[in-house]
């Protein structure tokens, strides 16, 4: 089996590096190895971020480097100088064992670990000379994120780096979804089009009021799947029909649900109501249909494929021109995360509002009378609902 290595993405020299791929292919270990080696060679420390406090407490925090210790990697990466790691007070210390089996640990840590949910508590602390920041498992299959999570993450990065620019930041996750608030923030709009082995970059350039231009580079790598190199020995345990999960584990396919497809043929005459769900990256058309005695919603995505000169991977983008051409401004309902006084504008499609027409979509969701053009349309709707349930003035 071939484990993941950072060699390809490091050639991009990006400020932010997204690494996604199948489970247990060595993504996290590759970053931990990089942190240890970089500290040994340059003295630059590592910073490891997890979403929740429970992810770093007790045994979970203490066992992070256990596999590397057992595999002799600490000894290998430090040319035999250190053999172990001690976890104390949310920091990691390299240690060596003498001939009498006595352990001695460094006084200064080589890495710190943080819980994003507790990020406000770190503001007054100092974390000098951090060269690598790793956010492990930044993406969740259940779409459950902290309120304003990306802002919390950026604030924590600010706390760690302070005024320096020596840190390289990595965000690592299994391919559980192609929808993530981090992809949106960092301009990664082509994730659903990527294939294992793809490596792409995005560059942001902005001018400060002083006229000085700042350029930030973002790279994303979709790891090659281990099946190309014989796979993992553990693949025998996942040779079952639950393709949604097993393919993510064995070959890195996105763990996307198989959403129900429409069993009926319909025409424009069958459409009784159209609801639009809008974000910067998504236009979903949800049409209430009546076919015979059956009433249901059909959801499709209004997009177009765009491939700019020099791009290796094209992007599916919302087709706003088509949206403006086909929507009925007087009759259609609109859902978005924006605040609006428009009486036909709403936020949460799972809630009925004063307008009686808004009861149809929540009822269809509860009764499972909803069908989708594609799995991607289903994922986009579920992701929007997860965001909309937290959207209110009180949550700002």
Question: Model-predicted segments: where are they?
Answer:
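Phosphate/NTP-binding elements of NTP-utilizing enzymes
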Residues: 1-396
């Amino acid at each position: 089996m071939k484990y993941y290595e950072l060699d390809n993405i490091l050639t991009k020299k990006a400020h932010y590096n997204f690494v996604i791929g199948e489970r247990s292919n060595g993504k996290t270990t590759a970053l931990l190895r990089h942190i240890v080696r970089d500290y040994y060679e340059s003295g630059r420390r590592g910073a490891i971020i997890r979403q929740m406090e429970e992810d770093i407490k007790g045994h979970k925090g203490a066992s992070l480097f256990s596999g590397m210790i057992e595999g002799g990697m600490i000894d290998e990466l430090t040319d035999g100088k250190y053999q172990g790691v001690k976890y104390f007070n949310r920091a990691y210390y390299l240690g060596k064992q003498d001939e009498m089996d006595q352990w001695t640990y460094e006084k200064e840590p080589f890495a710190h670990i943080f819980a994003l949910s507790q990020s406000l508590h770190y503001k007054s602390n100092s974390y000098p000379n951090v060269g690598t920041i790793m956010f492990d498992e930044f993406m969740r299959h259940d779409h459950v994120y902290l309120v304003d999570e990306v802002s919390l993450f950026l604030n924590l990065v600010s706390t760690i780096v302070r005024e320096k620019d020596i840190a390289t930041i990595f965000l690592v996750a299994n391919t559980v979804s192609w929808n993530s608030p981090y992809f949106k923030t960092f301009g990664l709009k082509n994730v659903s089009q990527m294939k294992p082995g793809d490596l792409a970059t995005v560059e942001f350039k902005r001018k400060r009021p002083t006229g000085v231009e700042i350029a930030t580079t973002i790279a994303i790598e979709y790891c090659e799947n281990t099946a190309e190199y014989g796979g993992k020995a553990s693949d025998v345990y996942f040779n079952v029909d639950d393709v949604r999960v097993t393919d993510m584990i064995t070959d890195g396919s996105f763990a996307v649900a198989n959403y129900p497809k429409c069993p009926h043929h319909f025409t424009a005459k069958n459409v009784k109501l159209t609801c639009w769900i809008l974000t910067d990256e998504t236009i979903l058309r949800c049409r209430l249909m009546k076919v015979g005695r059956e009433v249901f919603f059909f959801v499709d995505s209004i997009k177009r494929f765009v491939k700019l000169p020099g791009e290796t991977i094209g992007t599916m983008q919302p087709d706003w021109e088509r949206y403006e051409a086909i929507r009925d401004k007087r009759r259609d309902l609109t859902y978005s995360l924006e605040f609006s006084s428009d009486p036909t504008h709403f936020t949460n499609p799972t809630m009925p509002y004063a307008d009686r027409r808004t009861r149809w979509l929540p009822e269809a969701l509860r009764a499972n009378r909803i069908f989708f053009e594609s799995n991607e349309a289903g994922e986009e709707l579920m992701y929007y609902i997860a965001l909309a349930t937290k959207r209110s003035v009180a949550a700002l």
